[in-house]
Amino acid sequence: MTALDILHTWATNSDVEIDVVNDHHSVVVLPGEKKLKTAVSVKESHHSLDCQAFIIRRPDENHLTFATYLLRKNLELSMTAFAVDHLGDVYLRAAIPREAVTEDLIDRLMGEFLTVADSSFNELLVRGFITSMKKEWEWRVSRGESTRNLEAFRKILDPDSQKSDTHMSE
């Protein structure tokens, strides 16, 4: 049984979406809450199972704060690590020796991909895109458009939200 066979068995048993790219490459689609989907590209080589998930594009601002967050987060991770490509886009990566691959290991690995991608996403948005988010919020409010996909950031983006919080605490 190959490492990808074990991955496919895990995906089937866990009711997780998986797409076959070719005999040595599949993509696992993990459902999240903050980051709605995390697609993990899984490639089997002679020696390892190489996994990579796109997390977020290159930040628009606060590059040092953004990068520092990623490096500090790497200290907490056991199987995965954040990486940045030549464009500055952020990925989560892991390489597992083929002989170490079991369903249990795949479960823990995919769990870490999901947990880290989901728990880091909003923090990375705020650190790297706050100016754009504020402009988007103002534009939507001024036109009566929905702010539903920005609701998680209301306290940061809506100046009126902070005023009403102050009045409530008095």
List the predicted regions and their residue ranges.
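N-terminal catalytic cores of peptidoglycan-degrading enzymes
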Residues: 1-61
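Short amphipathic alpha-helical segments
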Residues: 2-6, 58-66, 105, 109-112, ...
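Conserved short hydrophobic interaction patches
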Residues: 10-13, 69-77, 109-123
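Short, internal acidic amphipathic alpha-helical interface segments
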Residues: 52-93
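A generic structural motif
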Residues: 55-59, 96-105
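A contiguous, mid-protein "functional segment" used to position or interact
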Residues: 100-139
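Short, highly charged C-terminal tails/helix-capping segments
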Residues: 125-170
